């Protein structure tokens, strides 16, 4: 596996011939040692320190067209990385040069296929000025990204079941549900459940949409009642464990529908808080820290025109 580490540009106080300041390099080296990350190449995306990122773009618009010199630097970087497998980018500009994406909080800690370098996967994370100088609490995030950059992401087959009728729900529970499920709901401003998903493994999930964003039901009144009765059927099983992320939220909504799981309840948010109480608790953050997964939270926002379909997946 051929790996590289690319930073945005040399630090403001980096010595001649260096990419980072002495302190930034000390911190980065310690994090690389913790992650056992040993890149074959360490380089920058832009050869000179930049105070304001927008000055590299036409009209100062970040994420738009690069100015000629910045574009030529990007092109040189692309050529240099041909033949590499995985690149860890430290900073938003390095990520942008290889992926075209500029929102680092959205893609940080995930594998992104580069549209510019065939076969290259990019794992973005924060730059040295942040984790070495101002935000020490982001260092575990950087270590996690370094660990992810040691291997390529491999997409695994997944099956998402979309029921056409009530019989499909019972067929799913008979064929796929054992003694444990994980459950998630999405709701609207009227405090109704608009969609939910039930997963039995990382490769098997059932998704049910109840309403669209226009508050229009996707089922007949009789069928919707039967959907809730199916969930109550699952909730009555004392041998069925239910997993949630922030169980209080989901269970509060289920309770309004008289659905009260009688089996064991486990909550990944509370488990992580007990393990690492100082870290963020959102599902997107935890997935980027601990799971080999693609970025997905932004897809829900982009899908609003399609009524947030698959929002609960």
Where are these regions (language model features)?
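Flexible, charged surface loops at secondary-structure boundaries
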Residues: 1, 80-83, 174-177, 233-239
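A polyanion-binding, active-site-adjacent surface
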Residues: 1-154
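Conserved hydrophobic/aromatic pocket- or pore-lining residues that grip, position, or stack substrates
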Residues: 28, 184, 196
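Active-site-proximal helix-loop-helix substrate-binding element of RNase H-like nuclease domains
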Residues: 120-123, 128-131, 153-164, 191-194, ...
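Acidic beta-strand-to-loop metal/phosphate-binding motif
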Residues: 84-92, 182, 239-247
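Short hydrophobic/charged patches on amphipathic alpha-helices used for structural packing
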Residues: 74-78, 170-174, 228-232
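Short hydrophobic beta-strand that contains or immediately precedes a catalytic carboxylate
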Residues: 5-7, 125, 181-184, 265-266
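N-terminal accessory regions of nucleic-acid-interacting proteins
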Residues: 140-185, 189, 211, 224-227
């Amino acid at each position: 596996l051929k790996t590289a580490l690319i930073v945005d540009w040399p630090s403001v106080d980096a010595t001649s011939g260096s990419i980072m300041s002495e302190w930034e390099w000390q911190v980065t080296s310690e994090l690389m040692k913790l992650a056992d990350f040993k890149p074959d190449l360490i380089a920058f995306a832009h050869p000179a320190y930049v105070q304001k990122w927008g000055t590299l773009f036409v009209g100062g618009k970040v994420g738009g067209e690069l100015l000629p010199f910045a574009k030529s630097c990007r092109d040189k970087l692309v050529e240099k990385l041909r033949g590499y497998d995985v690149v860890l980018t430290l900073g938003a500009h390095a990520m942008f040069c290889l992926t075209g994406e500029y929102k680092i909080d959205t893609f940080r800690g995930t594998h992104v296929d580069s549209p510019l370098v065939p076969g290259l996967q990019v794992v973005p994370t924060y730059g040295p000025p942040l984790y070495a100088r101002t935000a020490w609490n982001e260092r575990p995030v950087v270590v996690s990204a370094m660990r992810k950059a040691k291997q390529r992401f491999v997409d695994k087959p997944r099956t998402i079941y979309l029921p056409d009728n009530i019989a499909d729900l019972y067929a799913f529970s008979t064929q796929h549900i054992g003694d444990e499920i994980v459950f998630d709901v999405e709701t609207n401003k009227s405090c109704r459940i608009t969609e939910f998903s039930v997963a039995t493994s990382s490769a098997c999930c059932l998704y049910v949409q109840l309403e669209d964003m226009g508050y229009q039901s996707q089922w007949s009144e009789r069928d919707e009642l039967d959907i809730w009765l199916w969930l109550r059927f699952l909730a009555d099983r004392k041998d069925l464990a239910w997993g949630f992320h922030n169980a209080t939220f989901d269970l509060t909504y289920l309770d309004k529908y008289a659905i009260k799981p009688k089996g064991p309840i486990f909550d990944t948010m509370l488990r992580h808080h007990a393990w690492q109480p100082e870290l963020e608790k959102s599902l997107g953050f935890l997935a980027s820290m601990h799971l080999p997964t693609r970025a997905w939270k932004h897809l829900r926002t982009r899908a609003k025109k399609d009524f947030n379909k698959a929002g609960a997946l």
